[in-house]
Design a protein with these regions (language model features):
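Bacterial N-terminal signal peptides
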Residues: 12-23
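Extracytoplasmic small-molecule ligand-binding "clamshell" domains
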Residues: 30-96
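Ligand-binding cleft/hinge of the Venus flytrap
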Residues: 55-64, 111, 150-172, 199-206
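Flexible hinge/capping segments at coil-to-helix
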Residues: 123-140
Length: 286
């Protein structure tokens, strides 16, 4: 199901949007020009995406002089499929998903978000055990199993002598209720998520959790252009996204989202992501 709403109405219907959505800017459709679609990875709730990306929508709408949509999907798999199908003109996606989109569908990397993303190991606040050995025979909770954070976390656990599928299994806990349930019952004594995902949780939920350790700092989100766009338009989009941090809209975006910068990115920085390509494709069902 696709839902299109104005920004003014969005906060009232965010629960509907979370099902797999498109969020539309004000009344540009009457002008007869198809909206420019920016796809944003659903690593947090639709409501948070809509709110934090409003300044970016306004910026591109002004610069492109056309309607702009901020769109997301129900989950990582759906977002990756939408990307492969070319549903968006521009995407903001996890670095590993972006690298696979580049390799398999020729999406073009334009920029990368800073700072790097901390991958963290989390437990209930009343669980004093800091050893990963407590996972043996139990489950590890993952917010987004296809994310670079999850893949890097599983790799790190392997280096600690714990193999997924042998020593423990994984369970998806994409929302506060499911995370609270699996951690609270002891089914999953530990969870892996990004610091951004942790901070996006309600204060009440965060108060029941503690960060056990930081596993790694990983590359930030990639901004990528649809390969079907003409080269000149791709270059224009790159110029616009690299100029965005210096604008008033950019400053508002960083204040809302917690990101600090959007900068140029090149092959030397992207090449190490190839180590996660096969695991990413497997996680996406490819």
């Amino acid at each position: 199901m696709r839902v299109i709403v104005s920004f003014k109405r969005a906060l009232a219907v965010w629960g509907v949007l979370a099902l797999g959505l498109t969020v539309l800017a004000p009344a540009w459709a009457q002008q007869g020009t198809a909206p420019f679609r920016i796809g944003v990875l659903p690593n947090v709730s639709a409501r948070l995406i809509l709110t934090s990306y409003q300044p970016m929508r306004e910026y591109f709408e002004r610069e492109l002089k056309r309607g702009v949509e901020i769109a997301t999907a129900q989950d990582f798999r759906a977002f990756a499929e939408n990307t492969r199908r070319g549903d968006y003109q521009l995407i903001v996606t996890a670095a590993n998903l972006g690298r696979v989109a580049q390799a398999d569908s020729n999406w073009q990397p334009l920029a990368i978000y800073d700072p790097k993303i901390p991958a963290i190991l989390v437990a209930r606040a009343d669980n004093p055990n800091a050893s990963v050995a407590q996972l043996r025979g139990k489950s590890l909770a993952l917010a987004n199993p296809q994310s670079l954070v999850a893949l890097a976390g599983l790799q790190w656990l392997g280096s600690q002598g714990l193999q997924n599928g042998t020593d423990f299994k994984t369970v998806t806990a994409a929302n506060d209720d499911s995370l609270g349930a699996v951690l609270g019952t002891g089914e999953a004594p530990l969870a892996i998520m990004s610091m951004g995902e942790f901070r996006a949780k309600t204060e009440a939920m965060r108060s029941t959790l503690r960060v056990v350790t930081e596993i790694a700092k990983l590359p930030g989100f990639l901004v990528m252009a649809n390969p079907a766009l003409p080269a000149a338009e791709q270059q224009r989009l790159k110029t616009l996204i690299l100029a965005f941090p210096q604008t008033e809209e950019g400053k508002k975006f960083f204040a809302l989202s917690g990101f600090a910068n959007i900068r140029d990115v090149g092959e030397p920085e992207l090449k190490p992501l190839d180590a996660f390509n096969d695991a990413t494709r497997k996680g996406l069902g490819g």
